């Protein structure tokens, strides 16, 4: 236990020597200028909610687009016919 007491005495001495020329008010001003932990957590939660909403909107848009494409896409036969006489391509096809 004597080693612990020695260590604590030495630590107190080193701490007191290191803090002699420290300007405590400037440190407190720097700490008070930083946002509180609650503010940081709220910002992170808001950013996460915005990202989740954007991703959900993107997925919903893709799903609705897919459903609309399937519903509106009606297969129609493609007929191959000769071009009309008024078409310039009609001159290329001989009779």
Swiss-Prot record:
TM ranges: 46-68
Signals that turn on the gene: By nickel and cobalt.
Localization in the cell: Cell inner membrane
Sequence similarity: To A.xylosoxydans NccY.
Gene encoding the protein: cnrY
InterPro entries reported for this sequence: CnrY (IPR035230)
Species, as recorded: Cupriavidus metallidurans (strain ATCC 43123 / DSM 2839 / NBRC 102507 / CH34)
Protein's name in the database: Nickel and cobalt resistance protein CnrY
GO molecular function: molecular function inhibitor activity
Residues on Cytoplasmic side: 1-45
GO cellular component, one term: plasma membrane
Domain of life of the native organism: Bacteria
Principal localisation: membrane
Membrane topology, record value: Single-pass membrane protein
Keywords (A to Z) from UniProt: Cell inner membrane, Cell membrane, Cobalt, Membrane, Nickel, Plasmid, Transmembrane, Transmembrane helix
């Amino acid at each position: 236990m004597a080693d612990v007491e020695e260590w604590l005495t030495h630590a107190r001495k080193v701490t007191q020597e290191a803090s002699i020329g420290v300007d405590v008010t400037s440190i407190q001003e720097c700490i008070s200028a930083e946002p509180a932990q609650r503010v940081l957590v709220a910002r992170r939660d808001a950013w996460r909610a915005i990202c989740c909403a954007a991703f959900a909107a993107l997925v919903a848009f893709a799903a609705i687009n897919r459903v609309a494409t399937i519903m509106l896409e009606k297969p129609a036969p493609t007929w191959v016919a000769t071009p009309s006489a008024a078409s310039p391509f009609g001159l290329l096809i001989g009779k």
